[in-house]
Structure formats: structure tokens, C-alpha cells
Amino acid sequence: DACHGSYSSKKWVNEIMGLTLNALGGNAFIWKFKHNIIHHTYTNVDGIDDDIAKSPLMRQCSTQKWMPAHRLQHIYILPIYAISSFAWAVLLDFIKYFKGKVQATVLQKMSVKENIVFWSSKILYLIFYIVFPVYFVGWQSWAIGFSCMQVVLGLTLAIVFQLAHVVEQTDFEVAGIEDKLIDNEWAIHQIKTTADFAAKNKVISWLVGGLNFQIEHHLFP
């Protein structure tokens, strides 16, 4: 909510609370660019929306090249989802940082402050999530606890966002990589490329903070 600018009416409060994403291993600056600007504008547009980025291991829409391994992706995809949050923290953010791009879109220039926040939070992540726990409880206990945390987080994030966009009833639209022109106006595009799920399940709604109402979220983020 803070990274969406909706936690508080005060920008500085949202900025501070948004840093809790850094505490989980992500980076608020890169995520806001990747999610708020790109994903919320070019939802399900192959080559632009990083949430459906093409991969040799996972094919998420018909415009992505089919590979023989994809016939088994329904089997091996769960372990990939399970490590996705850890990959986000230690790999994917760095790829975007050093390439200066999110898919085909040039990443907004980071200020000196944002560069300091990026590196300091990544270092603190390693210290508080790996170094300190291994030192105080031993590597075996750490490995079990850390793995359980990452599996739960990775599966939760993947399931929520895949059910909201990568399902049969959503469209996967095409846009020019350079001009980024989509067929429909923004609101129609959001409705066509997004899906609600478990809308009548109060437990799910509570657990995911209302993100199962994904159409509403995209129209009124």
C-alpha cells in the first residue's frame, strides 16, 4: 500500500513505510518503477510487463516462444515459484540495477540517495537474514527456517499474482516495444488483462489484503 502511495495521505509516510519492502529483500525504488509505472500501465503486454517476462523455463502467453521444456512447466514451476522471492532479493533487482532497464523500458535514474539505500539495504538483508542467524543459531537451523520463510513468501506472491493475470479469462495484448501503443484505452485494458479470484472468500481476502480483487486494485490502486 505504501509503495502504491495509498497507505497514507502524506507522501513522506508512504516513503518511509515503503522501505519495509527493502527490509524483505526488495527495493522500493525499482519496484515502484517496475510495478506502478510499467505493470499498472502495460499489464500483460509481452516484452514490456516484467511480471510476465519470458523465460526458457516458463511460457506465460502465446506470443512467447515455445520450448520443449514448457510441456512440463506445470510440474516444475512450483519449486521455481518457491525460490522466486529469494531470487528477487539477490538476483533480479541487481539485473535491473546494472542493466538500467526493466525489460525494454529504461529505468528511471536513481539519485545518490537511492543508490545508497539500494546497496545498504541489500547488505543489511544479507547481515540480518543470513549472517546473524547463522552465527546465533547455526547454519542448519538457519537453513530450515530461512527455507520455510522463502517458500511460503515465494508461493504466496506467485499464486496471488498469477491468479490475477495469467489465467484463461485474461487477455495478453501486444504493443510496440518502442512506441508502447496498446489497442485499448487504459481502463478497458486493465479490465481485459486482470482477473479477480476467490472474491467471496473472506479468509483469502484477509490473508492477501484484498489483492484477490485485482480488477478493482488496477482501476483504483
Model-derived features: positions:
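Alpha-helical bilayer-embedded segments of polytopic membrane proteins, i.e.
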Residues: N22-G26, L72-F86, K109-V160
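Active/binding-pocket-proximal capping segment
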Residues: M149-G154, F161-A187
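Membrane-embedded catalytic scaffold of the fatty acid hydroxylase/desaturase
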Residues: D1-M110, I177-P221
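Membrane-interfacial segments
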Residues: A2, S6, K96-K99, F136, ...
